[in-house]
Amino acid sequence: MGHMVDDLKMVDYYVGKGANGLELDVTFNSNGVAEYTFHGVPCDCFRSCTRYENINTYLDYVRQLTTPGDPKFQEKLIFLIMDLKLKNSPSSYAQFNAGINIADKLSQYYWKDDGKARAYFLISVPYVSQTAFIRGFQHRFEEKGLEKYYEKIGWDFSANEDLNSIRAAYQKLNITGHIWQSDGITNCLTRGDTRLKEAISKRDTPGWHINKVYTWSLDKVNSIKYALNLGVDGVMSNYAETLVTILSEDPFKQKFRLATYEDNPWETFKP
């Protein structure tokens, strides 16, 4: 998965490098209205932090790339991670509105052809204290009759919080599936593997409802290989081609491959 893919030029770049998933950073105003795909300073080392695009334009563009039959269709692109930047929407009211707004934007700009665009979306909320966003999203889906698109939506809490706290948050939301768990840190720093190993263990433990575990943002060959050997389901990187190359080599090509549209992102992989 390509990391911090926040303008159309970078979308084309990462798709061209073989990424089957892209992460986009979504910024909101104080009222919870999504405005741009934008990360800002600080960001990963050796990257530009200030690339951006209007969120409506971005969603319409990736709609074209993920719609079979469209002249711009890219078959390998199947997964989009929306990394929500909710710091400008600190109140529960604004976060609830942000959930409503993202549901609206997906229906207006991505699914506007009655769902012909086929990518899956992982909605990545930073903190368990921000579950008002999820409630707003769910409210709008049900209010507008968008429930059929739930099969395209998954959830993640991305701030490396305690896994038991995350589990409790999902229980309060009555979410028991379509759950990915992330673990990671900027490529400028190193991070231990204790929580990542714990997440993988919980994924394989009945009752935890974690379907996939991914790590970010890994750029070095040895770091990516180590994560794969631990058993992660996904790797987010600034260098998508590095992972593509690793997966073409022994011994990894015997165990792993890039996911395709035929793979269900909400099912736990059983080797």
UniProtKB/Swiss-Prot annotation:
Expressed by the venom gland. InterPro entries: PLC-like_Pdiesterase_TIM-brl. Disulfide bonds join 43-49, 45-188. Gene3D superfamilies: Phosphatidylinositol (PI) phosphodiesterase (3.20.20.190). It is found in: Secreted. One of its GO terms (cellular component) is extracellular region. It catalyses: an N-(acyl)-sphingosylphosphocholine = an N-(acyl)-sphingosyl-1,3-cyclic phosphate + choline; an N-(acyl)-sphingosylphosphoethanolamine = an N-(acyl)-sphingosyl-1,3-cyclic phosphate + ethanolamine; a 1-acyl-sn-glycero-3-phosphocholine = a 1-acyl-sn-glycero-2,3-cyclic phosphate + choline; a 1-acyl-sn-glycero-3-phosphoethanolamine = a 1-acyl-sn-glycero-2,3-cyclic phosphate + ethanolamine. The active site is at 3, 39 (nucleophile). The keyword Secreted applies. It is an enzyme of class 4 (lyase). Its cofactor is Mg(2+). Binds 1 Mg(2+) ion per subunit. One of its GO terms (biological process) is killing of cells of another organism. Belongs to the arthropod phospholipase D family. Class II subfamily. This is Dermonecrotic toxin SpeSicTox-betaIF1.
